[in-house]
């Protein structure tokens, strides 16, 4: 039993390549530099981008979420790269800095330059969870930046732009873009992750980086990020959707389909329905922009989809039995198990989101009692 499959958008060639290299992309034995051009050549990043900017006509953000989901069915490492790239493109589409968008959208869509989002810190800043990690001081017409970004994905060694939130000289939180070769920006070695190793994930040190207004994505993150957050989190949810679909399909096929006909049949069908319903709610909320005014509904969707993915992998294990624990037969399951472990901790983590929802419930209860 599997969740409903939408009209296919992922090219057969890309799907086959991802299947062939999923294990190597997870453990880092395949060159991470190849992922971005492969995704770009298949048109993954053009979905949901206006045709006037080089996008695929007749598509919207829901199609972009679906594209990330379908990549994640084959490789969450590749989907993580797709998420970072497509979110950065979304930042430029929403930026009032038209010159910045015009200069960089084409190479980003073509996969010639990587786009990295380091705005997780800013998302937590908006919720009062932590302070901004990069400060700016005025020096004539320039800002001079200092700070650190401890975990950033899609920092392709061949060239990248990274979006970062900074505390402007007047204290306003702003969003800027930094090119990989700007003086004072230093990329660490790749982080030694448990999984998703071919995702070009590293840390960035920012020491005396001088920028002028041409690199400003938006002057006020408090206005900008609530508008961008639904796309940021919605595309991120594609990781959970795709992984859940693949695990449910594997569970249904285990033992020549015996699991789906036996005691696990009902749980598999129920979870597939939950996945379809949660996916539909997510896409509808992002498309309608309801999540801009009601972000707590977005948080609930993110939590629900990550938990569904975890349950799906558990069902795959139960359906596969001991075969899932043997190499090489269980390699695909083992990778999905590690991928599922990542979903609760990617920022905003489930703990952070549940904390925010608990604060909201407490506030509403206090207001009701007043």
Where are these regions (language model features)?
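C-terminal helix-coil-helix/basic helical segment that borders enzyme active sites and/or dimer interfaces
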Residues: 19-27, 256, 275-310, 314-328
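A short core secondary-structure module
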Residues: 151-185
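A glycine-rich, basic-preceded beta-loop-alpha segment at the flavin cofactor/substrate interface
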Residues: 205-233, 247-259, 283-286
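Extended amphipathic alpha-helical segments enriched in small hydrophobics
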Residues: 235-294
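Generic structural signal for well-ordered, non-transmembrane alpha-helical segments
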Residues: 242, 269-276, 299, 303-310, ...
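Glycine-rich flavin
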Residues: 31-41, 45-146, 153
């Amino acid at each position: 039993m599997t969740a409903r499959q939408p009209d296919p958008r992922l090219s057969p060639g890309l799907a086959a390549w991802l299947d062939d290299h999923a294990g190597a992309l997870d453990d880092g034995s395949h060159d991470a530099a190849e992922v971005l051009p492969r995704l770009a050549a298949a048109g993954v990043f053009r979905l949901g981008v206006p045709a006037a900017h080089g996008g695929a006509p007749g598509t919207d953000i829901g199609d972009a979420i679906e594209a990330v989901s379908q990549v994640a069915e084959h490789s969450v490492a590749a989907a993580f790269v797709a998420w970072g790239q497509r979110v950065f493109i979304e930042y430029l589409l929403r930026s009032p800095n038209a010159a910045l968008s015009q200069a960089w959208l084409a190479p980003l869509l073509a996969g010639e330059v990587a786009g990295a989002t380091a705005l997780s810190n800013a998302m937590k800043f908006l919720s009062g969870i932590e302070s901004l990690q990069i400060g700016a001081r005025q020096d004539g017409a320039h800002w001079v930046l200092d700070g650190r970004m401890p975990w950033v994905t899609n920092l392709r060694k061949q060239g990248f732009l990274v979006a970062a939130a900074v505390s402007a000289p007047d204290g306003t939180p702003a969003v800027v873009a930094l090119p990989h070769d700007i003086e004072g920006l230093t990329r660490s070695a790749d982080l030694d992750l448990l999984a998703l190793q071919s995702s070009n994930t590293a840390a960035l040190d920012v020491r005396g980086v001088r920028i002028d207004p041409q690199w400003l994505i938006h002057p006020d993150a408090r206005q900008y990020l609530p508008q961008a957050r639904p796309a940021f989190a919605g595309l991120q949810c594609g990781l959970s959707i795709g992984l859940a679909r693949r695990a449910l399909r594997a569970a249904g096929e285990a033992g020549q389909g015996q699991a789906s006909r036996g005691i696990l049949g009902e749980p598999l069908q129920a979870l597939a329905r939950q996945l379809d319903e949660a996916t539909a709610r997510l896409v509808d909320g992002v498309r309608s922009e309801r999540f801009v005014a009601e972000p707590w509904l977005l948080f609930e969707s993110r939590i629900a989809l990550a938990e569904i993915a975890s349950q799906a992998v558990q069902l795959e294990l139960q359906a596969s039995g001991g075969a899932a624990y043997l190499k090489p037969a269980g390699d695909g399951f083992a990778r999905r198990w590690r991928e599922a472990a990542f979903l609760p901790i990617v920022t905003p983590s489930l703990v952070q989101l549940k904390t925010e929802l608990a604060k909201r419930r407490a506030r509403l209860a206090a207001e009701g009692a007043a």
